[in-house]
């Protein structure tokens, strides 16, 4: 008889709007406008993908990058999110996220296989951040 406890690794789950779909138990939505949402956002304008970030406590927005590839735009937004944890106050924010999200599945709208800030949150929450 195996008495070892099976441990499942938390994962990112794509949130759905289909009839009958339910949020899995113990999963946390991490998109905007939650405290875990990525302030870096992407928008397509014609053939160009733009990455923006809102400046806290102002009505200003900065364009971070403009690229022709959606995957690259998403990666730029994820990289910006990751870099936030290297700024003043970033370690405290990472500690808060780790306490709140440890061991939980994370829900976001990003498609599987695409860069997503929830992957950064999973690393932070489960001790895998480099």
Show which residues each predicted segment covers:
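Catalytic phosphate/metal-binding cores of nucleic-acid and nucleotide-processing enzymes, i.e., regions
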Residues: 2-129
């Amino acid at each position: 008889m195996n008495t070892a406890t099976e441990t499942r690794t938390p994962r990112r789950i794509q949130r759905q709007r289909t009839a009958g779909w339910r949020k899995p138990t113990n999963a946390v939505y991490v998109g905007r406008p939650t405290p875990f949402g990525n302030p870096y956002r992407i928008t397509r304008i014609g053939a160009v993908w733009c990455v923006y970030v809102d400046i806290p406590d102002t009505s200003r927005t900065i364009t971070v990058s403009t690229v022709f590839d959606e995957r690259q735009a998403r990666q730029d937004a994820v990289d910006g999110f990751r870099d936030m944890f290297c700024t003043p106050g970033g370690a405290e924010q990472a500690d808060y996220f780790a306490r709140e999200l440890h061991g939980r599945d994370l829900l976001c709208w990003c498609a599987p296989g695409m860069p997503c800030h929830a992957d950064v949150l999973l690393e932070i929450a489960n001790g895998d951040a480099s």
